[in-house]
Amino acid sequence: MAKNQDESKEKRKNLVLSRFRWSEQWRRPWDDKWLRWYKTFRGIVPKLPEGEEDRSNLHIPYTYSTVDAVRSKLLTACFANRPYVSFVPKDADDVENAKNMETLVDSQMNRTDVEFMVRMYTLITDMLIYGGCPYEVGWRYELRKIKRKVPMVDESGILLGYEEQEIEVVNWDDPDFQPFMIDDLYPDPEGTSIDDCSWVIRRRYITRKELEAKIDEGIYKVKDLEAINQAGDRISEGKQDRLAAIGAADAYADEADVGGRRYELLEMWEDDRVTTVINRTEVIRDEENPFWHGKKPFGFAKFDPLNGEFYGISLVEVIEHLQAELNTTRNQRIDATSQTINRMWIVLKGMGLEPADLVSRPNGIIWVDSMEEVPKEVEFKPPDPAAYQEESIIKADIQEATSTYNEARGAPSDTKRTATENAIRERATNIRFETKLRIFEALGLKRLGFFYDQLNQQFIDDIRSIRISGEDGGYEWQEMRPEDIAGRFEYQPAGSSIEPTLDKLEYRTNLLNLYNEFKEDPEIKTLELKKRVFEAFGIKDTEKLIKSEEEIMQEQQEELAAQGELQAMLAGGGGLLPGMGGGMY
């Protein structure tokens, strides 16, 4: 039996390694592109040839400013409102549970120790640089030992002092969202998306301490740790290649240079199975997919998807050659200007002049035997004014390709336009951003909501006390049981739309005037009109702010009942309120 298990693991190991090599070979052209785009984003330029070190070799950070403009707009639009993801019930019985799940997920995404925004920031950054960014969502359970001071009292209750005690608490028992480098994702070359791939391999690196912790938890089963150690140390190749490209690390560093021993894990996920190979020598995990949702626990956010292709188009890819042209144009202009500033001379051989004699100095004198032997200055023409116009054309091309005009960057416009022209231009720009926003919401936030939902329903098996913000600005606590979050839901990102800034104020003002004009009109549905007003201010979850017709009717009935009680009290007390008589107090 043991022999059959060993043979089965050997087959699985060979399958993982063969698929890894296949994906690695297929992905190689993208590896070169990713490194090139990373260097463009970081502003890394090749060194000048020997003897030409005095030439200008600048990188103009226009790619960075373009990425930053798009990144800021996407991040602001997606996370303008909380909760970031709304849960919509599929069945009528799940309305209340959808609200509970929404509250739970919102609290999990906004834990003070989660740094959700930082992770989203890095995800969007990588997506813009490389065209996509993979992320993994699993369940994380973590215990932590903390020290506390406990009061010590005697039998009579007198405080004697404090004793230091060490206790173990649950530090994390929630979903864990982790973006990771695109270099560490090896997809099925035949697939076009995570779900479409028959398998996906994630490469990761862990320390010995992390490995031993997983062994203790029973997740990994190691047969021969010594053989694994002898297989050699591993380094994060993609990360080291990037750092080496900017001169920040040695791509061939040994273990001492990267902080100690690392173990490479090749984790192959199929919809129904997961297999992990360590240091390409031994299978340490081979089991059924532990997640109820039955999917690979990955997502892949794309900036610009292409039909039939796994990787999309990168923002840096679009402007890469324009950035190179911008660098060349600026450096050529600087070199030309330097030539006009740094004067050169034509001097006959044998005149006895030294180069130092031709250096400009106060009251300087150049001695010659004849005026015919006067050194002649070499004249260089200053750069043509058209060279400055060329840079503006290049920047305009970049702005047109990425829809990041000066107004979107917070810079003044180069051209004077009328207010109408600016409004039309901004609407067209925002339509393009809105499209990119919808793609990111579909591939990022909706899938993230799906994972959080499914993992919560699977792993929460006790009563949870959720901290929520109260109406008075304080905090309230809401208890939730597993049955309170069960159900089938759909996911709707709650971010605000990207509105034109030039005409939105006028639109809102007109809408408010319209509301004031018709709010008392019996033929107008006032609630629907109120929704339009809220939506004009970018608020989507209007149902949380506007009372339903049922709630309004109930309040009216309660008010009528209260008035009836008051009238009855007045009638029974002779028209006076209780406690009031005709005398003096």
What are these regions (language model features)?
Residues M1-E53, S107, M127, Y135, ...:
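C-terminal anchoring/interaction modules
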Residues K3, N97-A324, T329:
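Extended, regular secondary-structure scaffolds
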Residues S56-Y62:
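Long, contiguous juxta-domain segments that are non-catalytic but functionally important
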Residues A69-V70:
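Basic/charged alpha-beta structural segments of nucleotide/phosphate-handling enzymes
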Residues V85-S86, Y135:
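Helix-loop-helix transmembrane hairpins and adjacent membrane-interface loops
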Residues D93-N97, E390:
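Juxtamembrane loop-helix boundary motifs flanking transmembrane segments in multi-pass membrane proteins
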